[in-house]
Amino acid sequence: MRNSNRLFINSQLGFIITLVAVLVMSACSINVKKNENGEDKKVDIETPVGGLHVSKNADVRDTGLPVYPGARVKQKDDNGEEKSANVNISSGLFGLKVVAIEYESDDPPEKLITYYADKLKKYGSVLECHGSSNDDDVDVNEHDSKDSNKLKCKGNNTGNKVELKVGTEDNQRIVAVQPAEKGKGSTFALVYVQTRGKDTI
């Protein structure tokens, strides 16, 4: 008798889950905007529980930082990978916003580091971290104490890539500067990350 009740409850539960999934998906709205070349430039997805918005046309004003004088937006690489993005995920439980844009400059990294260390000061104490060009140091961690919300340098803090960080784990601005791969000059990224929720994503 218990097994038949459990089987009945499981089948009812399965039916309810399927019904909810169908209702959620049918209430889902997807909007894709393309550029003049037919490439996707903006995607908006709305569901009853939240939304996802992705745009390849990030606006530098959303980072809260100026563009270094004379710098140029870095073009797509050989793989066709975009060099800017604006991602926004929102729901009643959590949210995540990331704005990132890559640039290149003819000036050496030291000049850019000095420039952005000064510009970041208005947001608080600036942390300087060092790493290799393979390190991606944007961390959004669950924090269990007030100290764990502070920004930190990761790894052994050595290398030719410099990251200037300001803010907290759930509201940070990052400038990542490194020597250009070919020739002289620099490449750099301006990044803004904001999260919200009981436990950070």
Place the predicted regions along the sequence by residue:
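Bacterial N-terminal signal peptides
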Residues: 14-25
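An acidic-aromatic pocket/loop used at catalytic or ligand-binding sites
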Residues: 2-12, 28-201
